[in-house]
A protein has these predicted regions:
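Active-site-proximal beta-strand/loop segments in catalytic clefts of secreted hydrolases
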Residues: 17, 42-45, 70-73, 98-100, ...
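Metal-dependent catalytic neighborhoods of phosphoester/phosphodiester hydrolases
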Residues: 78-90, 105-115, 234-238, 263-264
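C-terminal regions of proteins
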Residues: 236-240, 244-245, 253-326
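Active-site neighborhood of divalent metal-dependent phosphoester/pyrophosphate hydrolases
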Residues: 67-78, 92-120, 251-255
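Active-site environment of divalent metal-dependent phosphoester hydrolases
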Residues: 22, 48, 73-79, 102-104, ...
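Short, aromatic/basic amphipathic alpha-helical patches
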Residues: 53-56, 107-126, 261-273
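Active-site metal-binding motif and surrounding structural segment of the metallo-beta-lactamase
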Residues: 37-38, 47-97, 212-230, 243-248
């Protein structure tokens, strides 16, 4: 098992990135003594003018990415991923995706198709760089390593809870509506005492079927699924049904043309008792300033600071203001 060594500090940093109109990326780091010792990426997006993913990677002087998860092939989770593949993925990179059936490929963009061609040809072409490809579904362990120091060991794991295997099986003979989101991967990150739920674009049909055993307690952070849409609104109900306390933090990215996130969905997280809800931009378009927003949250695994979880809002990112009753 791979080991990361530290002396004085061990932190998990999570950057949820969104743009003015659409797009979602998550860059996370395990930092040992202030240095990014492990880098992960969940989805990618860029505009013609801006690439906040590369900005974050370059700031941390990242030369290679250890873990990539492409949750599903919609463009707002895909654009720029080919560039990441070429520049940052190596033989040691674990690249995770969902196993799209051939009949569905024509539903997606040319960039998505090109990525699938690269993935499927990676072990047959001598010209393509080699890396570890994993097709994720529910209850699949994607990564496991140890952070070692100060006479203690802290396990880091990445575990998928979606897509649901039964739903994917049904799709072979069932409805072909909303193809992409049924394939969406959902992940848990675990490090030390912290549990982080990255819910991709997982929607209600999948949320209802998440196995109780796939949810490890407590959940400290949720990336709200599908940009806070009604079609993915059941997650707080699912968690409350398991008598789970609300997380300290929930975060959502924007999909402005569809007016996402929806206020009534965010209200469900408020009513559940979330400590704070952050958005990567303001739904009032005139208030945007730089075109992207980053919700940067740092978890102090050694609990050395006054606050073990700290969040910094970068660019257009904002705190969601709860609507007052009456």
């Amino acid at each position: 098992m791979r080991k990361l060594f530290f002396e004085d500090s061990l932190k998990l940093e999570l950057n949820v990135i969104g743009y003015q109109n659409q797009g979602e990326s998550i860059v996370f780091f395990i930092k040992t003594d202030g240095i990014a010792a492990y880098t992960g990426l969940v989805d990618c997006y860029k505009t013609e003018e801006q690439n906040a993913v590369k900005m974050v990677l370059e700031k941390e002087q990242v030369e290679k990415i250890d873990f990539v998860c492409w949750t599903h092939p919609h463009d707002d989770h895909t654009l720029g991923l080919e560039e990441i593949w070429e520049q940052y993925c190596t033989n040691d990179t674990c690249f995770c995706c969902t196993d799209i059936i051939q009949a569905d490929l024509d539903l997606y963009s040319e960039e998505a198709k090109l990525l699938f061609q690269n993935i499927r040809g990676i072990h047959t072409s001598s010209k393509r760089k080699k890396m570890r490809i994993m097709y994720l579904k529910d209850s699949t362990q994607a990564e496991r390593l140890l952070c070692v120091g100060n006479t203690k060991k802290y396990e880091f794991r990445i575990q998928s809870f979606a897509p649901n295997s039964a739903i994917l099986g049904e799709r072979l003979i069932g409805s072909r509506d909303q193809q992409g989101n049924a394939y969406s991967i959902g992940l848990f990150l675990f490090l030390g005492q912290y549990s982080i739920m990255l819910a991709g674009d997982v929607e209600n049909q999948t949320i209802r079927r998440i196995a109780d055993g796939d949810i490890e307690y407590p959940v400290d952070y949720i990336k709200i699924p599908h940009h806070g849409s009604k079609s993915a609104s059941f997650l707080p109900d699912k968690m409350r049904g398991l008598n789970l306390l609300a997380p300290d933090i929930a975060a959502a990215t924007l999909f402005r043309i569809h007016s996402l996130p929806e206020e009534q969905v965010l209200a469900k997280y408020d009513n559940w008792g979330c400590g704070e809800i952050y958005l990567t931009g303001n739904m009032e378009k005139g208030k945007d300033t730089v075109g992207y927003g980053i919700v940067k949250t740092t978890f102090d695994i050694l609990e050395q600071n006054e606050y073990d979880i700290e969040t910094e809002l970068i660019g257009d990112a904002v705190v969601h203001q709860k609507e007052m009753a009456g």
